A protein has these predicted regions:
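Immediate post-signal-peptide N-terminus of mature secreted/exported proteins
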Residues: 17-51
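Classic N-terminal secretory signal peptides
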Residues: 1-20
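Surface-exposed, polar/charged faces of alpha-helical domains
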Residues: 29-32, 47-90, 94, 98-101, ...
Length: 105
């Protein structure tokens, strides 16, 4: 077997593992939970603005908070091979709780 054929064969066998690993990382339950909360908060912010409960300025601040939290989640995941630890999740949830309370005022 030539070196080129061996390299091609190796690439074929490694591709499925990479695809599976990427899918696992993307859909990791802790990441999904945090990101679903961010998405839900953005929907709540939109609803509160429509109902006149919060101003557009307040909404902008709240969305910026959510964007920061999402950025932290991405950074944490990149440090831990595509997932976040329970400690990371706890810290992110505390931040999300604070933002959630501000939405509900």
């Amino acid at each position: 077997m030539t070196l080129a054929a061996f390299a091609t064969l190796g690439a074929l066998f490694s591709a499925p593992a990479s695809a599976q690993e990427t899918q696992w990382q993307k859909d990791h339950p802790r990441r999904t939970e945090v990101n679903d909360r961010v998405q839900n908060q953005n929907k709540r912010i939109t609803k509160e603005v429509k109902e006149g409960e919060i101003s557009k300025t307040q909404a902008k601040t709240l969305r910026a908070n959510d964007k920061t939290i999402r950025g932290e989640e991405k950074a944490m995941a990149s440090q831990d091979k595509g997932h976040i630890t329970k400690t990371d999740q706890r810290a992110l949830n505390q931040q999300l709780n604070q933002n959630s309370q501000a939405i509900g005022k």
